[in-house]
């Protein structure tokens, strides 16, 4: 009876994996990473004042970056932001 439980658990976990795996590959993920352009702007943890650009879901907008931390939705120029995030 012990082997039957183990096989049942393996079968259950296999089915669970097959059902949830497509969700991991949804539109919010590209090449295994979260789509940068969907992240919110994030000033970071420091108090410097660098002008940067982020994609707000529609277009690229300026924000002040503190110089450390934050996320990858941060570009040095509007052109770089549009190149990465604007839909063709």
Swiss-Prot record:
GO MF: potassium channel regulator activity; serine-type endopeptidase inhibitor activity; toxin activity
Where does the record place the site Reactive bond for trypsin? 47-48
Which residue intervals define the domain BPTI/Kunitz inhibitor in the entry? 37-85
Q: Which stretches are tagged as propeptide in the UniProt entry?
A: 28-33
Which sequence ranges are marked TM in the entry?
Answer: none
Q: Supply the Pfam families for this chain.
A: Kunitz_BPTI
> Key word Disulfide bond present in the record?
yes
**Gene Ontology cellular-component annotations:** extracellular region
Q: Which domain of life is it from?
A: Eukaryota
Query: What function is annotated for this protein?
Result: Serine protease inhibitor that inhibits trypsin at a molar ratio of 1:1.
Q: What is this protein called?
A: Kunitz-type U15-theraphotoxin-Hhn1m
């Amino acid at each position: 009876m012990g082997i039957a439980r183990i096989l049942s658990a393996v079968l259950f976990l296999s089915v669970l994996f097959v059902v949830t795996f497509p969700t991991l590959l949804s539109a919010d993920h590209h090449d295994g990473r979260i789509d940068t352009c969907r992240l919110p702007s994030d000033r970071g943890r420091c108090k410097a004042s660098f002008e940067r650009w982020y994609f707000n879901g529609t277009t690229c907008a300026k924000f002040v970056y503190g110089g450390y931390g934050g996320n990858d939705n941060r570009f040095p120029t509007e052109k770089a932001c549009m190149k990465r995030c604007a839909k063709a």
